[in-house]
């Protein structure tokens, strides 16, 4: 299993330095959606990493992906969400609200 990365220049440089080769540097949502599609169609790729900002821009494209997609913060830091999906899942499963 290989890992694919889709991100802006600042994000992908770190993954290239770590030795990953399936790295797509994108500058628009259209490029990102195309890169995600290419990685999704590659049978050797099992995990796709992208940034939260790109994930928000191409949410519809990501929702159809059959691989594991992980969204990481970019150089500007994490996106603060009103309803964090992980917090909602924990609250529903455990009955405790995480602050």
UniProtKB/Swiss-Prot annotation:
Keywords assigned: ATP synthesis, Cell membrane, Hydrogen ion transport, Ion transport, Membrane, Transport
Example of a GO MF term: proton-transporting ATP synthase activity, rotational mechanism
A Gene Ontology cellular-component term: plasma membrane
Signal peptide extent: none
Keyword Cell wall biogenesis/degradation: no
Subcellular location(s) per record: Cell membrane
GO biological process: proton motive force-driven plasma membrane ATP synthesis
Pfam families per record: ATP-synt_F
Topology within the bilayer: Peripheral membrane protein
Biological role stated in the UniProt entry: Component of the A-type ATP synthase that produces ATP from ADP in the presence of a proton gradient across the membrane.
Family designation: Belongs to the V-ATPase F subunit family.
Description of how the protein assembles with itself and partners: Has multiple subunits with at least A(3), B(3), C, D, E, F, H, I and proteolipid K(x).
Protein name: A-type ATP synthase subunit F
Organism of derivation: Methanococcus maripaludis (strain C6 / ATCC BAA-1332)
